[in-house]
Amino acid sequence: MSRLNELLQQAGNIGRNEDGSITRLGFSEKYFQALEFLKGRMQELGMQVEIDPVGNLHGVLQGSDPEAKSIVIGSHMDTVMQGGVYDGMLGVTGALEVAARLKDEGRTLRHPLEIWGFNMEESSILGGTFGSRCVTGMLDPDIPGYAEKLAKFGCSPEKAKAAKRDISKYECYLEYHIEQGDKLDHTGIDVGVVSGIVSIIDYKVTAKGMSNHAGTTMMANRKDALVGMAKLIVAAEERARELNDTLVFTVGKIAVSPGQENVIPGQAVANFEMRHMDKAVTDQFYADIQAFAKEIPNCEFEFVNTSAKYSTPCDPRLIKLIDDVCTEKEISHVIMPSGAGHDANAMAHEGVPIGMIFVPSVKGISHQGDEYTKPEHIDLGADVLYQTVLKLDENGV
């Protein structure tokens, strides 16, 4: 087993459940256990290390040029409930492998090399990419009710503000990640050069009907909110398949009121999520869903936009640089979008050029205990990351 694969298994298995899955939620005991473990590895590599006010891990290898901006590599160290070893942690340990190879070769970069292990990238009441949004200053902790949410994690608006960095000193941000989809695995391609991160648009959809007795209300007289919601979901699912072959639509949560087996549901609330690179596609899809809702009898629908993270393009220069590295090393690769959100979003939102490198997820499985990427792909992707850093150090973005 390679050094990187061994480190990934050690760090990534912190928080292992009896069923083999991993639960290492942001701000949890297991999260900070992983943080301390990786902090020790950073110190072994001679990095200047700190834990910032919101639980992000930060390490620096100083460069030879005090005027040069930092090359930044990172990802997140938290998982979803019952997640896997590789999501996020691959990027942090892969970044540490870059630092380790520099040490092996006695090489000092001209640019400082900064490595971030971010807290709470996964969705929570604080919103996704929490740690990186604090670092970039993208997060506004003063919005109403947010202080109470932060307090649940022993955090505060003051700590969130104190985590902000001067990202004008960042040359670029690179993130090494598993694909979390099946394109690379299905096609047998070794590396994905990410072109951008898709829009993720969420709506809270409420169907309003009328609660009544389940036994005495005839079928012709019912105003069943759950039936209306089901019809809308099926119509939206079919439309998503027709509209665009890279549009994805998910209803991951639904709640019914009053939620009793002998009462017709008077209300159903669901989360509708749509993802695509092109805003015009998600706008059209949303308009189509609203039109479908108007045609469904015995129900009224209300739509509230709860989150809108619009697509983020990767920097064309970094796309070309990573593409060139793969070509020079004769690594099979493809330029492709990311269907998942990443900490790179927050960096790009505040003007930092971003690049991302994907390696295959076996069977496209992620956010589950059987998430898996082959060891040879892990080492291959890390080498692409290392060579990219060397080229960036020589020529800049």
Can you say where each PLM-predicted feature lies in the sequence?
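N-terminal capping segment at the start of a domain
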Residues: M1-S28, N305, I365-S366
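Zn-dependent metallopeptidase/amidohydrolase metal-coordination segment
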Residues: L7-N13, N17, G74-S75, H333-Q387, ...
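A non-catalytic alpha/beta surface segment that caps or lines the substrate-entry region
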Residues: R16-Q62
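A short beta-alpha structural unit
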Residues: R24-G26, T250-G259, N271-M277, F301-I319, ...
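Active-site metal-coordination/substrate-binding segment of hydrolases
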Residues: K39-Q43, Q48, L57-S132, T136-A151, ...
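Acidic, glycine-rich active-site loops and adjacent beta-strand->loop/helix elements
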Residues: G55, M77-T79, W116-I125, Q180, ...
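Midchain, well-structured core segments that form catalytic/ion-binding scaffolds
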Residues: M120-G128, S132-K279
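His/Asp/Glu-rich mid-to-C-terminal helical/loop segments that flank catalytic regions of hydrolases
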Residues: S195, T217-M219, K223-E242, V359-V397
